Amino acid sequence: MNIHEYQAKEILSTYGIPVPRNRVALTADQVERAAKMMGGHCVVKAQIYAGGRGKAGGVKLVHHPEQASDVAKELFGKRLVTKQTGPEGLKVRRILVEETVEIAREFYLSITLDRETSRYCLIASAEGGMDIEEVAQKSPDKIHVLTIDPFTGLRTYQARKIALALGLSGAVCEDCVELILNTYKCCLEKDCSLIEINPLVVTRAGWLLAMDAKISFDDNAVYRHREYPDMVDYSQLDPLEITAGKYDLAYIKLTGNIGCMVNGAGLAMATLDVLKEFGGEPANFLDVGGGATREKVAEAFKIILQDSDVKAVFVNIFGGIMRCDVIAQGIIEAANEVHCPLPIVVRMDGSNVEDGKKLLLESGLNVQIGDNLGDGAQKIVAMLAKA
């Protein structure tokens, strides 16, 4: 679960992490008033669920309130396109107005989940303000990584080692140690999958400030925090993702034209890879989970068909907990309800597989059965080419 920059900064500030003075605004008039509060000279920052806003024209330095208002009028309602949004971009509905500071040095700091070790990982670099992936490619020696033992937690000496590695000393070094420890505390208590501060700066006056911040929460822990659902900006989400969430379906929109329905995240990833291998382009990632009912399968299928980019559907199911005949019934029910004319290939195996195949072949749908994953992928690509 993602949140906006201004929300991330509100959370960080409650943990004693210093952030610039700021105000969030929903209208150009509010932006102008906020700019006056900042003394006129300030930064106007579009709030969207994506990075790369500066390069897309979403971050502007202004010198007086009227200019801030003019910039806001340009940004509100505009779709910002960055490398993280896809070609459709994300619409700007909120703007953060923030004071300017004189920066002496910039750093990168983040705590994220390391999937390989299943532990939190602290990443820091003296190359702040840049794309960390770019730094990793060009100057990997400038990135400092620390895997945190969950039993001992992040220790003070480890935080100090990172601060010293960034070239800090004296009082600002100790401030950085405290900031790192507080960031880790925030990660634990708020069930974050990511906290990223980029850049973390030292001002000319010698103060540390989190100039930009990103926080993502673990979706599986949201139930422990009643306030989290109210923090979601649904205007930043794909409508189909919102619908999928209501049925506890994992859905991610992609850029291709083959709709995919799979049970299990690992099998779903393998399905996307095999489709690409045979020249297909997946339109989505959709995991119905291991214990889906006929109704849930039907809703998943209807969600796929609501995407106008989808020109064919590939279903790849292993019926362990799920029965293949139940899957087939859900597909048939949904396809008939929306009068689906698209070519469909179903590859299924497991419980009641023959009953499931029989139901599909007798349904009257434009459906073929895949003998295995590779055969199914080849068939859907071929059917799409003929469509």
Curated annotation (Swiss-Prot):
Cofactor info, note text: Binds 1 Mg(2+) ion per subunit.
Catalytic activity: succinate + ATP + CoA = succinyl-CoA + ADP + phosphate; GTP + succinate + CoA = succinyl-CoA + GDP + phosphate
Binding sites annotated in the UniProt record for Mg(2+): N198, D212
A GO BP entry: tricarboxylic acid cycle
Keyword Ion transport included in the entry's annotation: no
Pathway noted in the entry: Carbohydrate metabolism; tricarboxylic acid cycle; succinate from succinyl-CoA (ligase route): step 1/1
Entry's Gene Ontology cellular component terms: cytosol; succinate-CoA ligase complex
Highest taxon of the lineage: Bacteria
Domain ATP-grasp: 9-243
Keywords: ATP-binding, Ligase, Magnesium, Metal-binding, Nucleotide-binding, Tricarboxylic acid cycle
The keyword Transport is annotated on this UniProt entry: no
UniProt-listed Enzyme Commission number(s): 6.2.1.5
Cofactor: Mg(2+)
Function: Succinyl-CoA synthetase functions in the citric acid cycle (TCA), coupling the hydrolysis of succinyl-CoA to the synthesis of either ATP or GTP and thus represents the only step of substrate-level phosphorylation in the TCA. The beta subunit provides nucleotide specificity of the enzyme and binds the substrate succinate, while the binding sites for coenzyme A and phosphate are found in the alpha subunit.
Family assignment from sequence similarity: Belongs to the succinate/malate CoA ligase beta subunit family.
Name of the protein: Succinate--CoA ligase [ADP-forming] subunit beta
Organism: Trichlorobacter lovleyi (strain ATCC BAA-1151 / DSM 17278 / SZ) (Geobacter lovleyi)
